[in-house]
Amino acid sequence: MLSTLIKKMFGSRNERTLRRMEKSVMAINAFEPKMQALSNEELAGKTQEFKERFNNGESLDELLAEAFATVREVSLRTLGLRHFDVQLIGGMVLHEGNIAEMRTGEGKTLVATLPAYLNAISGRGVHIVTVNDYLAKRDSQWMKPIYEFLGLTVGVIYPDMSHKEKQEAYKADIVYGTNNEYGFDYLRDNMAFSLTDKVQRELNFAIVDEVDSILIDEARTPLIISGAAEDSSELYIKINSLIPQLKKQEEEGDEGDYTIDEKQKQAHLTDAGHLHIEELLTKAKLLDPGESLYHASNIMLMHHVNAALKAHAMFHRDIDYIVKDNQVVIVDEHTGRTMPGRRWSEGLHQAVEAKEGVPIQNENQTLASITFQNFFRMYNKLSGMTGTADTEAYEFQQIYNLEVVVIPTNRSMIRKDEADLVYLTQADKFQAIIEDVRECGVRKQPVLVGTVSIEASEFLSQLLKKENIKHQVLNAKFHEKEAQIIAEAGRPGAVTIATNMAGRGTDIVLGGSLAADLANLPADASEQEKEAVKKEWQKRHDEVIAAGGLRIIGSERHESRRIDNQLRGRAGRQGDPGSSRFYLSLEDNLMRIFASERVASMMRRLGMQPGEPIEHSLVTRAIENAQRKLEGHHFDVRKQLLDYDNVANDQRQVIYTQRASIMAMTDTQEVVEMMREEVMNSLVDTYIPPQSLEDQWDPQALSDVLSDEFKIKAPVPDWIDKDHSIQPDQIKEKVLALAIEHYDEKVRKVGRPVISQFEKSIILQTLDNHWREHLAAMDQLRQGIHLRGYAQKDPKQEYKKEAFSLFTMMLDNLKYEVIRILSSVEIQTEEDAQVVEEQRRADQIRKMNLMHESLSENDEASETQTFRRQEKKIGRNDPCPCGSGKKYKACHGSLV
C-alpha cells in the first residue's frame, strides 16, 4: 500500500527515468537545426571533432546530445530514416548500460546506431550481438551507410571466416556478430599460442539484440570447445605390444628396465630401460634410428610410453579395474565398487584398453568452456534490446545488474488481445484453431499461428493440408528463407505457422514487404514500374487493415509469459490494427502439470461439454500463475548453475590471466626458476619430510626420482653417509644447485632467447593439458556433489572447497610437469625448440569441435545472491579469486 502511494506521488522508477531522459531529448532536438545546416563534409567531420573533445577530457555523456543529433541527421540523409524521440530515449538507455524494452516494429536496429556511434568515439570498440548470422549480416549492411558516412569502420563476424579476415573484422569500430561467435572467439583466443594469433580486442561495450533470448533462454547452455583427448588407437596398440618386453628391476643395483614406486603409484624407466625402449621403438618404426626418446619432437611419444608402462606395471585387472561388456570399468580403491562412465586421464585409460585388447575409445574432451552469463558479464559495459523483458526484470537485475526500462511506443498500440479459450481435449482445440484460420481466410485477414515445438507445427500443418488451406511453415532452421517468409506473412489471406522463436528480428508488414517487391524488379526498371508496384502494395496494405490487421493465434501457452508476449507482439506494430488469442486444452503440458485441477473444477462447475470452450478471466489468471511458478523454477535453476559456474569462472580468470601474461613475456627465465625451486623443494619434502627423524627418510627414492624423471644425477644417500648432521634444507640447496647446473647446460647449447621460446611453448602446452584435465575433474565433481546434501552438508560450500583443492593440485602438477619436461627433453638446435610449438598448433586444430550444449536441469535449488559484473584484470595485490584469502601474487598469481 505504501509503495502504491509513493508511486502515485512520485511516479514509478520507469516513469522517473523517462522524465529524466525527456530533458536530454529536448537538448538533442535543439541541435537539429544546426545539423541540418551543415554540409555533408562538415557533418562527417563531426566524428573527428568528438574524438578530439573526448581525448581532451569531455565525457561521452557530455557529448551525447550532439552525437545523437549527428547520427539522426546522417540517418535521414543516407537511409531516409529519422529517429523518433522514443528511439532517442532507447539509445540513451543502451548507452547507460541497461535494457530497452521496445515493442516489435519500433526500430531497434536503428536505435542501436546511436549508442554504437557514441561509444565508438572512445576507440575501444563496440560489439552488436544478434541471434543468428543472417541478422548480423543484414543489420551491418543496412546500417553501414550511417557509420561509413561518419568515418567509422564496420565489421561482421561469422563462422566460415579465415583467421586473418576475423582479425580485420574485430579491428573495426563497430562489429556485428552472433553471441555464439563472440563467445567461441573468446575461448579460442585463450587457447592461442601467441599474441598475434588472437582476434578479439578488449571486451568493451556490447549491445545485445533480443537480450532475453541470449541472456536468459540460453543462459543454461555453455559454449564448449572440445577436441580428441588423445592420439589414434593404433599408436596405443603398437606401444602396448612393446611394454611386455621390458623387465622389472627387482632390487637396487639389479638389472632391469623399470622400477616401480608403490607409494606414489608410479613406474619409471631406468637408464638401461631408456636404451631398450628406444631400440624397440626404432624396430617398430615409431622412432628414427639413432634418435633419442627425449628429443623435443618426441614429447608425445614419451607420454604414450609412460602411460603404457604404468598400465602394465601398476594397474591390475580385477583389482584396479574390471573388464565388462568389452569395456574397462574402474574399481573404486576405497569402496571396491565399480564406477561406470569414469575414465582415467592423461591417456592411461586408453593404455589399459590397449593392454586388455578391448576397443579403444577416442573420447572428446572439453578444452575450454564458458556460459553466456559469465561471458557477457566480462564486458566493461553491457546493454540490450528486446520487445519483452519486463517480466524478467528481476533476473536481469540480480544476475547482470541491468535495469529494464520500458520505452513508450511511437504510436498508440491498438491490438486487441482476446481472452484465452480452454477446451477439454487437444482435438477440440485444434479444430477450433482450424475454424478461426478458415474465418480469417474468408475476410482475407493474414494469420500467424504460433506453436511451442517443431512437432506441433508439423502436426498443425497436416491438419491444414487436409482442409486444403494454403500455408507456410517456419521451423527456425533456415534463417534467410525464414526472413523472406516472415516478410510476406502480412499479405492478404496469408497463413503462416511458426515455432515461437522463428523469424525474430524481421517485422511482419501489413500487405507484405514493399522493399522485397521493389528488389524483385529488374535493375533497369522504370519509375512507372516502381510506382505500379507501390500502388499494388498500398492496395494490399489497405485490404489487410480493413480485414482487421494481422491475426495471432497461439496453439498453446509457453512456459514463459515472455514468449507468449513475443508472439502477441508480432501484431499491432507502429499503431497497426491486429488481434491475438490463445487456444488451450487441459491436455497441454503446462495445463496438465500446473493448472489442470483448478481449471478442470471450474469447467465441471460450469457444466462444460466436449467441444465447448471456457472463456473467463479467472482461467487466464490461473494459467499466468502457473507460468509465474515455472518462471521462478527456471530462474532458480539458472541462478544455481551460475553459483556453481562462478567457482569455475574464478579459476578460468586466473588461468587465462596467467596464460596471457606468459604469452606476453619475452623472457620466461624468472618463471621457470620459481617453478624449479618449488618443485625441487616439494620433492625433497616428500622423501625427506621436514621435522622428521633420519630413519623416516628415503634418500634412495629421492635420488631415483631425480634421475628417472628429471635426468638429474643427485647422490643423496652419499651426501647423508658423508655428513650425518646434514639438514633437509641443506639437501634442498644441493638438489636445487644440481638442477640449475643441469639446465644451464641446455641454455648454453642454444642460447637464452631460443630456450625462452621453448620454455614458453612447454609452459603453455602443459598448462592447456592440465586445464583440460581439470575441467573434466570439475565436471565429475559437479555431477556428484548434490549427494553431499544427504550428509547434511551444503553442496555448494563442499563444491567450492573441493574445487579449490583440485585447482591447487592442478597447479602443483603443472609446475612439476613443466620442470620434468624442461629437465629431461634434449635440445640441440633452435629447430628443436620450434618443433614443440608446431606440434602444439597442429594438435590444437586437429578435431577441434565447437559445441553449444544444454546442461542438466537435475540440480538442487540454491540460495540466491547478487552478482556484479566481473572486472577482467586481477591486480597483483588483489585478493585471489580462488577464495583462499591470500593476495593474488602470493597464491595463484605466483605462476606469473
Swiss-Prot record:
What EC number(s) would the UniProt record show? 7.4.2.8
For molecular function, the Gene Ontology terms on record are: ATP binding; metal ion binding; protein-exporting ATPase activity
Q: Where does Zn(2+) bind?
A: C880, C882, C891, H892
Reactions it catalyzes: ATP + H2O + cellular proteinSide 1 = ADP + phosphate + cellular proteinSide 2
The annotation note on the cofactor reads:
May bind 1 zinc ion per subunit.
Binding positions for ATP per the UniProt entry: Q87, G105, E106, G107, K108, T109, D507
Q: Please list where the region (Disordered) is annotated.
A: 853-879
Which InterPro entries does the record associate with it?
Answer: Helicase_ATP-bd, Helicase_C-like, P-loop_NTPase, SEC_C_motif, SecA, SecA_CS, SecA_DEAD, SecA_motor_DEAD
Q: Per its database record, what is this protein's job?
A: Part of the Sec protein translocase complex. Interacts with the SecYEG preprotein conducting channel. Has a central role in coupling the hydrolysis of ATP to the transfer of proteins into and across the cell membrane, serving both as a receptor for the preprotein-SecB complex and as an ATP-driven molecular motor driving the stepwise translocation of polypeptide chains across the membrane.
Please identify the protein, giving its name as recorded: Protein translocase subunit SecA
